[in-house]
UniProtKB/Swiss-Prot annotation:
Catalysed transformations (reactions): XMP + L-glutamine + ATP + H2O = GMP + L-glutamate + AMP + diphosphate + 2 H(+)
Source organism (scientific name): Rhizobium etli (strain ATCC 51251 / DSM 11541 / JCM 21823 / NBRC 15573 / CFN 42)
Family annotation (PANTHER family): GMP SYNTHASE [GLUTAMINE-HYDROLYZING] (PTHR11922:SF2), GMP SYNTHASE-RELATED (PTHR11922)
Gene: guaA
Protein name: GMP synthase [glutamine-hydrolyzing]
Active site per database record: 86, 176, 178
Domain Glutamine amidotransferase type-1: 9-202
One Pfam family per UniProt: GMP_synt_C
Amino acid sequence: MTQTAHPDSVLIVDFGSQVTQLIARRVREAGVYCEIVPFQSAEEGFKRLQPKAVILSGSPASTVDEGSPRAPQIIFDSGLPVFGICYGQQTMCMQLGGKVESGHHREFGRAFLDVDKDCELFEGLWSSGSRHQVWMSHGDRVTALPDGFKVVATSSNAPFAFIADEKRKYYGVQFHPEVVHTPDGAKLIGNFIHNVAGIKGDWSMSAYRQKAVEEIRKQVGDKRVICALSGGVDSSVAALLIHEAVGDQLTCILVDHGLMRKDEAANVVAMFREHYNLHLLHVDASDRFIGELEGVSDPETKRKIIGRLFIETFEEEAKKLGGADFLGQGTLYPDVIESVSFTGGPSVTIKSHHNVGGLPERMKMQLVEPLRELFKDEVRALGRELGLPDSFIGRHPFPGPGLAIRCPGGITREKLEILREADAIYLDEIRKAGLYDAIWQAFAVLLPVQTVGVMGDGRTYEFVCALRAVTSVDGMTADFYHYDMEFLGRAATRIINEVRGINRVVYDVTSKPPGTIEWE
């Protein structure tokens, strides 16, 4: 997160909504830089960023409860345009003298908005007398407006669904314009940013690249940087950006834990050495990792072993180089946004995340994180800007622990080889069918289950392979991909015929939630 003022930016105050990041994505899509700050530190964030407009997010809290969160008064004293969404609308009204009460008719899901009056946010989009679909999710509702506000649109259960004080440039909506279920929502946010706040929208990956390179050079000076290269998009883009800034002062280390997809480590090493002239060390630590993982079935234990061994191996290799002053990481913006809690309790850990963990503290290095202001889609755009091929940028996400968490139960080299071959065939069939780019993530899972089969004249007793494919926008929610049955038949037949050790293939039709994308 940037530590200084950012010209032509938007500040998003987060009250704990599950979709606050979508607001930021819509602002970025409009070509404008923005930052999310939790309400507890919003005043500090406002002073630091010096934005040109403010958006107040939704929240699971109720504005009528004692101690419920509020926007800092400095926002309303600043004279800047403010857009309140759902809870953001309610707290804005309460803080400016209006009234809110718990609704007797809660409104969740699709609703229709009737436009009563024209307003600046509707320019080129909506007109008086028109009706539009929106997405509601609220219990409380505004019952009396502050001075200066007027109602510009209503719904059947929300008489103050869209309000405006055009003199002060304050706008509030009871629905969620940031979600895709509000078809014109992104355009409404764009109108607020461009038409009301007067922000041009010239923030681009080219401009970000130039700024990031300058900041890396200033931070690193003539010191050395090491970077853990996994072969994923995030670490690869971070490495290329750091290399552009400091050249041979960067050394990348690829720790091959033996849990990658077929030929993946070799292909990554070849690409970076041949096309980008990076100083890259390829460390084959597969015996070390698989030796400790063999027989381990608990997924959390697997992740912790992999994380510990990664740190130990990386640390050993870095010391052989004589150490470094900086550690480069592909940390993204969603990783650094502070979570908002109303209870003070910790969030539930669904899965431990595998990354470089405690390396900076252990090795007394400072972090270089050139992607920490970007979302995943922006990292891909930056990768294209840096010259990475689309075939690499568009690869499906791959977990840090690799095939270890796609092999439930105990791990052996034999199982990993069986899984690696099945996965390669599955992905090959997806590419042949022209489906790869339509799917967010696809992979094979080797189940710790054996079943009876018949091949030729003999009886078999071999493993079951599960195929998984999902569609998603950001990985937060996902639906299983609806394949044609002929495709599944082709993929299953090839896997059974070509992979020794598998005699049955099944397809996973679980969405997220209730399931997760990965099996472990």
